[in-house]
Amino acid sequence: MKLFGTSGIRMKNLDPLIAYKVGFAISKNFKKAVIGRDTRTTGNLIESAITAGLLNGGCDVTTIGMVPTPVLGYSAKDYDLGIMITASHNPPEYNGIKLFNKNGTAFDPKQEKELENIINNDDFNECTWDNIGCVVEDKTAVKKYFEYILQNLNLNTNFNVVVDCANAAGCVVSPNIFTEAGCKVISVNSHCDGRFVGRMPEPNETNLKETVDIIKGLNSNGRNYVGIAHDGDADRMIAIDELGRVTDFDKLLAAFCKYLVQKTGADKIVTTVDASMAIEEYLNEFGAKVIRTKIGDVAVAEELEKTGAIFGGEPSGTWIHRDIHLTPDGILSGLRVLEMMEFYGKKLHEIIDEVPSYCNMREKISCPDNLKQNVMDYVSKEGEKIFEKKPETLDGVRFSFENGWILIRPSGTESYVRVRVEAKEKDFAEKLMKTGISMVKTGISGK
């Protein structure tokens, strides 16, 4: 049975028996674990089940309660591994399990496959009564993270900030840490509720409409509030500018990369194959190299360690700040957006509007999982003929041009093939998208 997707285990109505087996499998090679959970109603159930499996295999467990993923990832340094019970941006009926190494990086596919093999082969090591693991509670994890982040923050301006936590794990840290950093904070959806009663946890324009309206209302009197919104476990963030615009993920990432290079003199940053070409164009004048890697925080973190780059970010709002820790951190990212504003002495909308605007298109085509590889093989060969270019196959199939690019990639969690296009001209973007969709559909039908 395949359990792990592109970001740990995520399932609708996650079976606690699966969680128990995951815990039991972990205990074979790890003997000291820390566990946290987000606000989902099934969080206690899944945490209890995975804890039972860990204990049965002789692994000691420290529980830190309801916390954001960045807190769990930071805490993992004191244990053999960290376990986060979360389904991130998915709806409330979902839950999941994400595993972290001591250094804060998420488990890579090889590590996850090893656990799957233990589970599928029933290769467990059950302990005798006198070797069962024990459970302790640590109520200081949030405080330790809080203090560590503030010690490494360089913010002297008292910004006005609306913080939207989606009734999720960010509630226990984000409003307070922005306040402690000197901001005047208005909290939205800031009480913990695993039903996500205020909005769904995906921080997109549709779900953030009420928060946008609040910011527009506040700023009608010239108050200059910006917004920081999180997903379900606060490993991501998106900003809302003073005009009430949910910032484009790609443009925010490009602006932040430029800021880091200008401020620190960094000679390289890491991003993924689906990020905007505006990043290269923005950083070329500073001689900084853009290193592209596979989609996902695991690949980004691995590349950061390999290259020594100080920052890696995805256009999903998943950013890793290597100088602080290797866990994606939406809380720290939000604070550092404010540092960027202070550095330039500009409003957020002014910074974002300086980033080049290109035509971006995204489509997804239904595709049975068993046909995905055939489709990608066809797209690679056919695309090479059509575009008269060698495909880039780091993650999916990508063709790059002087004025744009197309990426065709199978979803790792759903029965879709995704087509992403970016171009400087709308006509070229539409042409690329039409060609991409046609290739995928032909690859599926075989005709």
UniProtKB/Swiss-Prot annotation:
NCBIfam families: Arch_GlmM (TIGR03990). The modification Phosphoserine is found at S88. This is Phosphoglucosamine mutase. PROSITE patterns: PGM_PMM (PS00710). It comes from Methanococcus maripaludis (strain DSM 14266 / JCM 13030 / NBRC 101832 / S2 / LL). Mg(2+) binds at S88, D231, D233, D235. Transmembrane segments: none annotated. The keyword S-adenosyl-L-methionine does not apply. Signal peptide: none annotated. It holds the Pfam family PGM_PMM_I. Binds 1 Mg(2+) ion per subunit. The active site is at S88. It comes from the Archaea. Its cofactor is Mg(2+). Its EC number is 5.4.2.10. Activated by phosphorylation. Glucose-1,6-bisphosphate or fructose-1,6-bisphosphate can activate the enzyme in vitro. However, since glucose-1,6-bisphosphate is not believed to form in methanogens, the physiologically relevant activator might be a serine kinase protein. The keyword Isomerase applies. Keywords: Isomerase, Magnesium, Metal-binding, Phosphoprotein. Belongs to the phosphohexose mutase family.
